[in-house]
Amino acid sequence: MAKAIIDIETTGLNPMEHRIVAIGVKLGDRDIILMDESEYYLLVNFWDTVEKEGIEKIIGFNIDFDWQFLKLRSLYHRLKIKHFRKYQGRVDLRQILNGSGGQYRKGTKLVDYCRFLGIDVPEDDANGSEIPELWEKFEEEGDEEAKRKICEHLKRDLERTWELYKILVDCGLIEE
């Protein structure tokens, strides 16, 4: 069974009002970063990648947020999600670490857990709240540096989530 770390970047927090601008997929040592000015084609490429790579287990930090966006934005574009039910068993690292249904509490962001566990988080690292502004710069001004920053942020989050996942497996909080 192929497993993948999934992370998305969006223009906001509400999938009924905001869009996905980038999707990251980590398969072992391989990172796949998908970005397209058309959200429709971005999602088509994502679901094609999931099928082509045989991904059956989706893992992420606060993956329920990502999944809700992927599901509703695909629905908005009338895209078929093949094998929808098998992804309902996704692994949400935030829920495992937070307990209590994974509800947000101060100090429970990915970077907080990474710093706590010694996973590298540079002080000058971009954070998700900067993505809408970066996307706007790219979309309206063609700012390639803004696009690069979104991709780099996504790659770093994929790597951190993978490192966190490995620690949780090693410590027995997740069984493979």
Curated annotation (Swiss-Prot):
Q: What SUPFAM superfamilies does UniProt report for this protein, alphabetically?
A: Ribonuclease H-like
Instruction: Output the superkingdom of the source species.
Output: Archaea
The record's listing under InterPro entries reads: RNaseH-like_sf (IPR012337), RNaseH_sf (IPR036397), YprB_RNase_H-like_dom (IPR038720)
Pfam family for this entry, one: RNase_H_2
Stretches of the chain forming a coiled coil according to its record? none
An annotated Gene Ontology molecular function: nucleic acid binding
Task: Supply the name of the protein.
Answer: Uncharacterized protein MJ0365
Question: Which organism's genome codes for this protein?
Answer: Methanocaldococcus jannaschii (strain ATCC 43067 / DSM 2661 / JAL-1 / JCM 10045 / NBRC 100440)
